[in-house]
Swiss-Prot record:
GO terms for molecular function: rRNA binding; structural constituent of ribosome; tRNA binding. One of its GO terms (cellular component) is small ribosomal subunit. It comes from Protochlamydia amoebophila (strain UWE25). Belongs to the universal ribosomal protein uS13 family. This is Small ribosomal subunit protein uS13. PANTHER family: 30S RIBOSOMAL PROTEIN S13/40S RIBOSOMAL PROTEIN S18 (PTHR10871), SMALL RIBOSOMAL SUBUNIT PROTEIN US13M (PTHR10871:SF1). Residues 95-122 are annotated as: Disordered. Part of the 30S ribosomal subunit. Forms a loose heterodimer with protein S19. Forms two bridges to the 50S subunit in the 70S ribosome. It comes from the Bacteria. Coiled coil: none annotated. Residues 101-122 have a biased composition (Basic residues). PROSITE patterns: RIBOSOMAL_S13_1, RIBOSOMAL_S13_2. Keywords: Ribonucleoprotein, Ribosomal protein, RNA-binding, rRNA-binding, tRNA-binding.
Length: 122
């Protein structure tokens, strides 16, 4: 398996798909990177030469924010929202949906499992 910026990418998949295994790179960005490097998008990842891997590593570290740096930036943005007590920050802190979704029903993914409440005795 070829290693790109410290992450193993699958070697039997097309290069266009293999690059999407890196955090922060989707199909569109993957195609953009392949065009910049002048590689064939249909080529399998295990056919990359050492020179191609070096160029790919150089491009990813210099021009794009991926993997650990991107994760760190997202976490810092969320911490900043929480610290300034913005509405979005409060929703993050309370573990509720942040982008205006309804919460009377649904939103179980964000809230977690149901907490059952016992009925009052008469």
């Amino acid at each position: 398996m070829p290693r790109v910026i410290g992450i193993d990418i699958p070697d039997n998949k097309r290069l266009e798909i293999s690059l999407t295994y890196l955090y922060g790179i989707g199909r569109h960005l993957s195609n953009e990177i392949i065009v910049k490097l002048g590689l064939d998008p249909n080529m399998r990842a295990h056919k990359l030469t050492q020179d191609d891997l070096a160029r790919l590593n150089g491009l990813l570290t210099s021009e794009y924010m991926v993997e650990g740096d991107l994760r760190r930036q997202v976490q810092n943005n969320i911490k900043r929202l929480i610290s300034i007590h913005s509405y979005r920050g409060m929703r993050h802190r309370l573990g509720l949906p942040v982008r205006g979704q309804r919460t009377k029903t649904n939103s179980r993914t964000r809230k977690g499992r149901r907490k059952t409440v016992a009925n009052k005795k008469k």
